[in-house]
């Protein structure tokens, strides 16, 4: 069975890491995955997905009828049994083209919170209605918050298949692995390593973490590790330098297990999330975590015993002080308990199996 996944540029973020983690299970169930990349370039994560067994295609997005014609021809030439749309941009048009080209199943995963306003909200309302009623598209929400926002904003019913993380890869590190990782990043034994993971877009709010770290009293020696792409301005790095924060900006990291092994605390200060994969990975790896009490991340409260904060610098600084003042062994024991619950609830087997069943059945939540 051939399944086409449609994404923007491939980066080491949620949907892409989920696809990599699920490739083995899907292959064992006779599902061959291919990816249509619609960004300007394939993206830095493309080689990783190719190694996982995906065949990649590239049609850079353009706002023109000619682009839609190219996508239609591509779909017509390839006999995909299912088309799975992961991007918000042009999702309606991809679903419509898949439908008219005769693809029997169209699945659209909503990976983020899209509470648009004004004219765009009206437009998306109509599009989602047509997707559901006329184009027979199955909508999947990746978290309770996403499912609620889709219903409240667009009256759009959806299945809920939770995001997953690579539960075979992210496990608590041994003492030896932890010591090796800290040496690799040059972290002294007496330092507290605080880690963030993800691109440096405004919604990820990493500037607030840097500001909070810069305001902490100097008795604590803190090393800030960031794995993920910075934007061209390198605003986070420049702020860290101005505020005297000892930082390691690592750029895109294909495998962040080493970052988690070295970390004493993982921080996710996002303004909102669909379902934060990096948080699942860190919690699955047994790292004590400080999460922003915001939509998307809040869905983890029932399963993750961790610290919570408002996403502003002052609140983050106060939460960091609380974490640093606590017994580190007690924090790590709580994190190990959270790791077990995360593995139970967000394993790749659970989520990817539900999608495999959906691909084969073609059924969904339709009124």
Regions inferred by a protein language model and the residue ranges of each:
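A short, active-site helix/loop in glycosyltransferases that binds the activated sugar's phosphate group
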Residues: 135-160, 165-171
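Short hydrophobic beta-strand element within catalytic cores of glycosyltransferases
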Residues: 36, 288-291
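Nucleotide-activated donor-binding/catalytic signature segment of Leloir-type glycosyltransferases, i.e.
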Residues: 236-251
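A conserved mid-protein helix/loop that constitutes part of the nucleotide-sugar donor-binding site
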Residues: 13-24, 192-215
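N-terminal strand-loop element at the rim of the active site
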Residues: 5-63, 146, 230-232
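Conserved acidic donor-binding segment of nucleotide-sugar-dependent glycosyltransferases
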Residues: 303-314, 322-328
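Short His-centered aromatic/hydrophobic patch
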Residues: 85-92, 110
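Aromatic "clamp/platform" in nucleotide-sugar-dependent glycosyltransferases that forms part
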Residues: 252, 271
